[in-house]
Amino acid sequence: MVDTQKIRNGIASLPKDIQDQILILLEKEESGNETKNMKLLGGITIPANTQTFDPKIIFAAGEHDGTKFYHGDNFKKYIFKPAKLVGGVEVQNFKSYESKINLYDKQIREEIGQQVIKPDQLWTAWKDLIFKQPQGQSGSLKNNGYSNVWYVQCADGIVRAVRCFWDADDSEWYLSCYELEDDFWNDDHQFFVGDDLVTSVPA
């Protein structure tokens, strides 16, 4: 929340009407960063992928190249096993939101948007983001045990929630996949939604 008194103290030398205008603008900006149950954390840009790579190699379970991965069963079935070589993928712009309370997928998507991405877009985003935090370092992805979630249209055409989170106990990135509405998400998880370059599929 905007601490109006602290801000007013800092701009006390300005005329009263100017102080009021500044506070109004700050409050409007803050309100625009939140929905009812989701807080906007910021935006990230994933560079275009121009070199073909094999996600089955760089995201294979186990430790390799200084990064360790663990795969959940649904992730293996719906994301990893059907994975194909990733070629050209356009620049992706995402906004990230943090859940403020326990929410189901339908509630989350009603607030942040219905956009979903395809697997090659997910692999490209993860290739950029996870390998900037290979040992759970600070960065765009949460590294405190909370999830980083994307809504992905899997190879079978079904939209599912796909997440990665840093498991500090085992020093590994845990990759998993869930059916929508399978359970609620606790507060403080991070959800990514894309811009108009991302495919839109009904909830």
Regions found by a protein language model. Give the residues of each.
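A binding-site-centric feature that preferentially detects glycan-recognition modules on secreted/surface proteins
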Residues: M1-Q115, L122-A203
